């Protein structure tokens, strides 16, 4: 296992805090895997759990589980290939329905580390899922879906994507910002591109001279997150239980979306 020197791991959590940030060393567990630093932050006021890290390949990932709106926002900052004439970086944003199996913010604020310098490997793999993001969001109007989107995705005004079934769930009222009394029609903040999306060729199959839109794929892998709470029987002789720990998981999501050309999806491979 390759080890990248890291700063001392910290946990900034008060006993009565509404916000807690746990900073840990993470590895995928593979023999040649790099170790990197990751923060997990629970905020009871905003009802969010943030997972943030910089991958060994230089991608900055922020995943926000918004329990109030019932969505997860994933921001990925990808460095550009300067020798190919690409921009220094580009930001992609994806909004998915649900908060997955992330434990709630209140539970995250109670997390502590016994061994801060340890390298964390998830106990369980939740596998790999494919997310077809065939619609785009108008970022400065997307507060009706989640109040956090305009801020998190502010650098992805043309590259914020959602799956069609998220739009359906918003229309059904199962997800969406609870702070705003008036619900806008989904068409106010989203644009469906499903007819074009189904006809796209993979960017990996295109040449750099091709300028038409193509289907791009980027992986969003979280190799360590608290996915459930553990309960133990009380020692006092009664039949009750108490929280006594967490179970940790890893999960990868293959984000598929429309890129305007191969030039903004140079990493795509088959």
Short names for language-model regions:
Residues 3-21:
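Cleavable N-terminal signal peptides of Sec/SRP-targeted secreted and luminal proteins
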Residues 12, 27, 40, 125, ...:
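Intrinsically disordered, low-complexity segments enriched in small/polar residues
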Residues 18-63, 67:
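Extracellular/luminal recognition modules and glycoprotein regions
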Residues 52-112:
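An acidic-aromatic
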Residues 89-139, 153:
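A eukaryotic "domain-to-IDR transition" signal
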Residues 135-270:
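A eukaryote-biased signal for long
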């Amino acid at each position: 296992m390759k080890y990248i020197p890291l700063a001392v791991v910290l946990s900034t959590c008060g006993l009565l805090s509404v916000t807690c940030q746990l900073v840990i060393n993470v590895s995928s567990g593979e023999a040649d895997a790099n170790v990197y630093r990751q923060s997990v932050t629970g905020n009871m006021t905003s009802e969010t759990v943030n997972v943030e890290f910089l991958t060994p390949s230089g991608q900055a990932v922020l995943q926000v589980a918004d329990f109030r709106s019932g969505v997860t926002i994933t921001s990925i900052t990808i460095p550009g290939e300067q020798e190919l004439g690409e921009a220094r970086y580009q930001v992609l944003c994806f909004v998915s329905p649900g908060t997955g199996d992330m434990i709630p913010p209140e539970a995250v604020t109670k997390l502590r580390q016994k061994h801060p310098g340890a390298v964390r490997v998830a106990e369980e793999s939740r596998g790999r899922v494919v997310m077809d993001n065939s619609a785009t969001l108008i970022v400065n109007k997307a507060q009706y879906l989640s109040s956090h989107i305009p801020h998190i995705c502010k650098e992805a005004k043309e590259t914020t994507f959602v799956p069609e079934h998220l739009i359906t769930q918003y229309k059904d009222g199962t997800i969406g910002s609870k702070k705003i009394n008036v619900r806008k029609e989904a068409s106010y903040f989203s644009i469906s591109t499903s007819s074009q999306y189904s006809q796209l060729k993979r960017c990996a199959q295109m040449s750099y001279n091709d300028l038409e839109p193509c289907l791009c794929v980027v992986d969003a892998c979280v190799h360590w997150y608290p996915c459930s709470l553990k309960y133990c029987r009380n020692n006092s002789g009664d039949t009750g239980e108490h929280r006594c720990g967490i179970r940790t998981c890893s999960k990868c999501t293959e984000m598929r979306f429309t890129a305007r050309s191969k030039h903004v999806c140079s990493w795509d491979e088959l």
